[in-house]
Amino acid sequence: MGEEYEVEIGPVAHGGHCIARTSEGQVLFVRHALPGERVLARVTEGEEGARYLRADAVEILDASKDRVEAPCPYAGPGRCGGCDWQHAKPGAQRRLKGEVIAEQLQRLAGLTPEEAGWDGTVMPAEGDKLPAGEVPAWRTRVQYAVDADGNAGLRRHRSHEVEPIEHCMIAAPGVSELGIEERDWSGMESVDAIAATGSQDRMVILEPRPGARLPLVELDKPVSVMRVEEKDGGIHRVHGRAFVRERADGRTYRVGSGGFWQVHPMAADTLVKAVMQGLLPRKGDMALDLYCGVGLFAGALADRLGDKGAVLGIESGKRAVEDARHNLAAFERVRIEQGKVEAVLPRTGITEVDLIVLDPPRAGAGKKTVEQLVSLGARKIAYVACDPAALARDLGYFRDGGYKVRTLRAFDLFPMTHHVECVAILEPAAKGL
């Protein structure tokens, strides 16, 4: 490590870096660079003879027109690993994400953007269209790491080392106003700060180091306090509520500590709108909400299916299932089952459905689950994905099972990072013949 190469930067790759080659043909994955630039790249990971090396652009010799000075003082080689594209204009960030989606669709599913019903654009979330130079403060949940001196900060890229910070520019106002960075967190491994979008609820989750005592938490705003137990890794209440209240599509959702909710304040509404516009639910439909979390899409479906419609949600997390059942208790024809999708589905006895929504974790649904879904003959399927590679792979499985992507929409719900959210709508291929 530490070797330096002067290289021409090639295309963007999945993961927040660009591809380059040394004069000897060695592949470099280079962070802090942009396509078309000439940079001095310093190797940060990998050994001679490896299939590829990781590197940072430590000097820009010929800059792209899309380059800007990173607004965050903690961005750059060897610094905070939270953001990937601080050095790129917002429009360029979205274009790069679109190029990654297109490459993954072609490589893993054999689909062009046109064949996927996608116009190639990545849309910003509402409220993120800001004047030049302004950074969207969107992250409603920030996991701060704590260094040996008790300073809160963020992890450096692919490292356990902590970059102490005074302020995270992409943290939502509700997180920033807690003043996490101003406190001494000695004895803590991490401090997870959550600011709900649909209420004034605030929560911090403290993870103590082995044998450490919990500090007295005095923050700038009222806050619930939870702790991660050393023995079982479970999250337990110390003070206040054990949940926050979020709001989307006109409905309030209880989200327990450790539960999943989209971190961009507009993400839940954006995704519900895209899914419902794609599915066009009808009164009386039977629908599945898979990997349903606290019931976001199940609630949206139930509101639209009427008294004769029905929704089955499946979720593996015990606390998320409890929250989903609480959130949707008013609907007699909504049922939430706990377990892995591929295990629970066969036990339900369901042989056909009208609509399916799946929002799997980053690894995607996988071949076995896709085959199960195809057998149900749904009129439409909405696939919500946070990883273009897993999405593309699974779309290939759906194609093999007789389904075709009718539309695909991409949303920049993680500005400054390489992450992107997609919603694909599928229908039986025979429908288009």
UniProtKB/Swiss-Prot annotation:
One of its GO terms (molecular function) is 4 iron, 4 sulfur cluster binding. Keywords: 4Fe-4S, Iron, Iron-sulfur, Metal-binding, Methyltransferase, S-adenosyl-L-methionine, Transferase. It holds the Pfam family tRNA_U5-meth_tr. S-adenosyl-L-methionine binds at residues 262, 291, 315, 359. The keyword Cytoplasm does not apply. The keyword Iron-sulfur applies. Its EC number is 2.1.1.-. Belongs to the class I-like SAM-binding methyltransferase superfamily. RNA M5U methyltransferase family. This is Uncharacterized RNA methyltransferase SAV_2389. It comes from Streptomyces avermitilis (strain ATCC 31267 / DSM 46492 / JCM 5070 / NBRC 14893 / NCIMB 12804 / NRRL 8165 / MA-4680). The lineage of its organism: Bacteria, Bacillati, Actinomycetota, Actinomycetes, Kitasatosporales.
